[in-house]
């Protein structure tokens, strides 16, 4: 099966194909938007029948579009997508690979040609060529592409630089998130890694380097205080080591076939003369890579996925700014169509099944039931009898999209946090490839979504996605201690610790599918009862800070352990300092 190739890894090389581009500017004012035309609801009134429906009560189930191609004469757009179930709203809204009569895109008066392009590098080249062609001929058909949100910093770093000769109007912008990976992208590892993350040190993970699924590994490792060796040619027994895979089937295949390679040993950052042979202990992959592991070898379980890191991987759509501003009304009408489609897919089983059927036609692979099954996600047993989770995606309605872009009621810009978090990680690990990346505000244009929200409040009536958080964490995904400074004998946080607290907040936002445990600890100086009370008061202070930054109160659990759980020797000053800590646990 062809695979979903994400945008981070080889993008710099591909963008070298861009040729000379001529300068120029056309103001969008002459084509300024008129009021976007509301999509027409056609269908019967019925009760939503899908689990966790976003529409409530006697909601309207829209009539499914016909299979006949639309001839509405509207703006033509080629939409490049990989085989990824997070795009179910687009499948439903378009009615087929080409816009069909009666579909939401037909009502929006656009004609969309959805093309499967699993090679993200080729999709990048298509965007670059489109910018050049549109510069020379404003009647050129539009080109959109949808990618993983966490991979965008590396993508934009290369693309923005390549398109600079065209001027600011021809830069790429991200304008809408239609859905997200919700479990299918994951790290699969031995059960021992899940039980004790420290056991992962010295282990190896096969993945596509600098890719979204590798980002899941990096977050899990960082949240557990584990180092990752960025050099896929060396071996560090005190870090998690990476084994480069060519794609998302190659990563699990290396595990399945018992792949091995020789590496130079690294100690404290210095390469030794000795060699060692390493195999594959774990994989970072996506569906169907996880299915292959389970069915062909087994022995690995999901230790972290986009089910837990629920904000990490939105399906973000981009185009060239000039085209978007020249066709603002079209863009807004398409956002309306995708938002309505998200509500339909979330609320009605026949709509979701229809999206699966369209997916099979677009991808020209499997059947609708296959894509529907892995959209929903499922539990199964692998060849060794272990329980494994496979697949899982989610569709956004307008409220979900607003929440992702920081336009929801809580004001938390989830995508900004995701973008900066993983941009910083890649820059830190690979400064020679990506020393910097474009500022979020330069490449994410919220104006289209803001306009739809302001002018069509009826589309905000669908319920946004909710997570039922555990009141007590029994399954830890990660645990990390922080040295937060308090006033002596007090729960008042010193200002110099605010940066640490903001780091905790951002990590919690990315891992939106998990509860946040805030556990206070002290050294053994003083009365045990007072220490226990102080540790809890300090944990409460951290909780209140997180709440002030937008983390829901029902997501946070607080405990104070006093001096009962030391991690270092209390007989030394250094040991006492380590024991005075706040432990952050992400779990369920």
Predicted regions and their residues:
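Periplasmic peptidoglycan-binding/tethering modules of Gram-negative envelope proteins
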Residues: 436-515
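Pocket-lining segment of extracytoplasmic ligand-binding domains
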Residues: 147-151, 241, 245-370
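Periplasmic OmpA-like peptidoglycan-binding domain that tethers envelope proteins to the cell wall
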Residues: 521-588
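Hydrophobic membrane-insertion alpha-helices, especially the h-region
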Residues: 12-25
């Amino acid at each position: 099966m062809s695979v979903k190739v994400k945008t981070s890894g080889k993008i710099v090389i591909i963008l070298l194909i861009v040729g000379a581009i001529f300068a120029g500017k056309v103001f969008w004012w002459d084509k300024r938007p008129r009021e976007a035309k509301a999509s027409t609801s056609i269908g019967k009134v019925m009760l939503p029948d899908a689990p966790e429906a976003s529409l409530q009560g006697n909601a309207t189930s829209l009539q499914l579009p016909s299979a006949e191609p639309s001839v509405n004469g509207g703006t033509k757009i080629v939409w490049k997508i990989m085989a990824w179930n997070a795009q179910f709203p687009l499948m439903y809204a378009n009615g087929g690979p080409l816009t069909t009569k009666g579909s939401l895109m037909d009502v929006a008066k656009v004609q969309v040609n959805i093309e499967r392009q699993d090679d993200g590098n080729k999709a990048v080249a298509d965007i670059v060529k489109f910018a050049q062609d549109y510069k020379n001929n404003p009647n050129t058909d539009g080109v959109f592409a949808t990618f993983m949100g966490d991979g965008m910093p590396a993508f934009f770093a290369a693309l923005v630089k390549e398109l600079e000769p065209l001027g600011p109007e021809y830069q790429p912008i991200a304008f809408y998130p239609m859905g997200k990976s919700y479990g299918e992208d994951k790290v699969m590892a031995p059960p021992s890694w899940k039980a004790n993350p420290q056991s992962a040190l010295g282990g190896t993970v096969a993945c596509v380097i600098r890719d979204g699924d590798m980002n899941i590994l990096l977050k899990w490792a960082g949240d557990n205080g584990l180092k990752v060796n960025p050099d896929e040619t060396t071996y560090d027994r005190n870090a998690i080591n990476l084994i480069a895979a060519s794609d998302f089937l190659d990563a699990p295949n290396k595990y399945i076939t018992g792949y091995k390679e020789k590496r130079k040993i690294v100690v404290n950052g210095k390469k030794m003369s000795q060699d060692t042979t390493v195999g594959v202990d774990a994989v970072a992959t996506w569906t169907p890579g996880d299915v292959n592991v389970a069915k062909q070898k087994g022995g690995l379980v999901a230790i972290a996925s986009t089910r837990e890191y629920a904000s990490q991987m939105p399906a973000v759509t981009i185009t060239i700014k000039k085209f978007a501003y020249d066709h603002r009304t079209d863009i807004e009408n398409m956002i309306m169509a995708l938002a309505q489609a998200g509500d339909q897919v979330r609320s009605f089983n026949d709509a979701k099944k229809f999206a699966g059927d369209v997916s099979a036609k677009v991808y020209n692979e499997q059947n609708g039931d296959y894509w529907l099954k892995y959209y929903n996600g499922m539990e199964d047993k692998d060849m060794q009898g272990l329980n494994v989770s496979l697949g899982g995606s989610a569709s956004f309605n307008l409220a979900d999209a607003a929440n992702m872009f920081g336009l929801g009621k809580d004001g938390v810009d989830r995508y900004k946090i995701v973008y900066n978090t993983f941009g910083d990680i890649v820059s830190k690990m690979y400064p020679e490839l990506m020393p910097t990346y474009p500022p979020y505000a330069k490449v994410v244009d919220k104006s289209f979504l803001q306009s739809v929200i302001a002018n069509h409040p009826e589309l905000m009536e669908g319920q946004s996605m909710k997570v039922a958080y555990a009141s007590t964490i029994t399954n830890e995904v990660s645990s990390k201690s922080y040295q937060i400074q308090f006033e002596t004998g007090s729960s008042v946080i010193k200002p110099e610790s605010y940066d640490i607290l903001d780091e905790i907040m951002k990590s919690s936002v990315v891992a939106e599918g998990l509860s946040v445990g805030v556990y206070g600890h002290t050294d053994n100086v003083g009365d045990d009862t007072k220490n226990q009370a102080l540790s809890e008061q300090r944990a409460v202070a951290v909780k209140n800070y997180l709440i002030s930054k937008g983390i829901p109160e029902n997501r946070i659990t607080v405990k104070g352990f006093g001096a009962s759980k030391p991690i270092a020797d209390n007989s030394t000053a250094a040991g006492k300092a380590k024991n005075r800590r706040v432990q952050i646990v992400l779990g369920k």
